[in-house]
Amino acid sequence: MSESNEPEILFGIYCPPHPQPLLSPDANAGYAKLRAAFDECRRRIEESDADIILVYSTTWASIIGHQIQALENAVWTHVDDDFHYLGSMPYEFAIDTEFAHAMKENSEKRGLEARTVEYEGFPIDTGSVVALQLLNPDNRIPSCILSSNMYSNRAETIVLGKAVRDTLAQQGKKAVVVVVSSLSNRMFTEHIDPAEDRIHSQKDDDWNRKILEFFGDGRLEDLSQLSRDIHGQIRVQKVVAYKPAWWLAATMGQHNNYDGEVLAYEALHGSGGAVITLTPASGSVGDKEFDEDDVEFYRGDRNVLDRGMLE
């Protein structure tokens, strides 16, 4: 894509996948705070002029390539695998089929294995259902949902994000992008009283709070570069790597030039649940750890390492 044909991403949202903020927000003060944070994000989306809400959900795991929801009117009733006692989640989502099919084509052009999902009754995952029910309850804005491939590593995930940028630029659509993922994902393996919910361990809480500092400072690319360390420290090894920051950085732009805001951070059955927003800033690229440009055309070095040197 040419430099003049950049996608317009209004802001990004990072939110947790578990159903408590949707189904039982009053069971715990923390769940209520997460629900209030979702509601604030919903308000911001409603006040924006977004054309599409794009969801990358870590609870929609794929094995063969990358799947893209393309059914124009996705209607079903979902029950969460773990928290089925909280009740059913009936949903009806308006999917941007034009975007979905173009996203498949652009993913394949970049060398990825991709396919659309377009049939009645396909089981949309908990994280996507929770996010879209809370962020876009009236289907005011069409959405599209992308899977998270269990085996993809950094390069493949980055390319997926760039395929998103290709598609948004190609169609001229303004987007709000949503990553659905826990921070730490260790959960209690027995029933707990929701009123006594807490982060699974002190180590998990310490790492979560450091990650939140980075998000609050808008340091998205720094988090992307640290993803393997994060995965090794606070993530159950269910998949190859912790991918949300890779995808979000590749989609929004691989730099630290964002205004970050942590709206809520609470425990969800032991895991770290946070609602965060990242808005592209209008200032300079900055001077944070990985503040090199994501170069498409070479025009000489920026000499960032010379900053602050004595004459």
Regions from the language model: what does each represent?
Residues D51-S57, K173-L183:
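Beta-strand elements within well-structured catalytic alpha/beta cores of enzymes
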Residues V180-I192:
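A structural signal for small-residue-enriched, beta-sheet-centric alpha/beta enzyme cores
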Residues K162-Q170, A175:
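Non-transmembrane, aqueous-exposed alpha-helical and coiled segments at domain scale
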Residues M1-D51, S62-V159, E190-E311:
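Flexible, D/E/H-enriched segments
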